[in-house]
């Protein structure tokens, strides 16, 4: 009867970050070369807002931090795969 919230949160944050990357991938790939665009900025903003609401309790914002880490990891992986395929 006991559920494992850690497993649920990690799979749900992975789903969120993959769907978030899909939403911003087109915008990122179509930007000009000199323009900086961080597809994970929404997750960064959410984690900062959480820290402002809960200044003394980082544990309350763990899911936001993990979602940002997952998004950033996926973004960098996609970026590496994209640059290695164009370099060939």
Swiss-Prot record:
Principal localisation: mitochondrion
Motif range (Cx9C motif 2): 61-71
UniProt entry keywords in alphabetical sequence: Disulfide bond, Mitochondrion, Transit peptide
S-S pairs: 40-71, 50-61
Biased composition (Low complexity): 9-20
Keyword Nuclease attached: no
One GO CC term, this protein: mitochondrial intermembrane space
Superkingdom field: Eukaryota
PROSITE patterns in alphabetical order: CHCH
Disulfide bond listed as a keyword: yes
GO biological process: mitochondrial respiratory chain complex assembly
Its biological purpose: Required for the assembly of cytochrome c oxidase.
The protein's name: Cytochrome c oxidase-assembly factor cox23, mitochondrial
Protein source organism: Emericella nidulans (strain FGSC A4 / ATCC 38163 / CBS 112.46 / NRRL 194 / M139)
């Amino acid at each position: 009867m006991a559920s494992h919230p850690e497993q649920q949160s990690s799979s749900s944050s992975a789903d969120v970050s993959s769907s978030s990357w899909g939403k911003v991938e087109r915008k990122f790939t179509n930007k000009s070369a000199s323009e900086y665009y961080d597809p994970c900025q929404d997750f960064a903003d959410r984690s900062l807002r959480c820290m402002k609401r809960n200044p003394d309790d980082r544990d309350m914002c763990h899911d936001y931090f993990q979602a940002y880490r997952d998004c950033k990891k996926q973004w960098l992986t996609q970026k590496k795969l994209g640059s290695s395929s164009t370099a060939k």
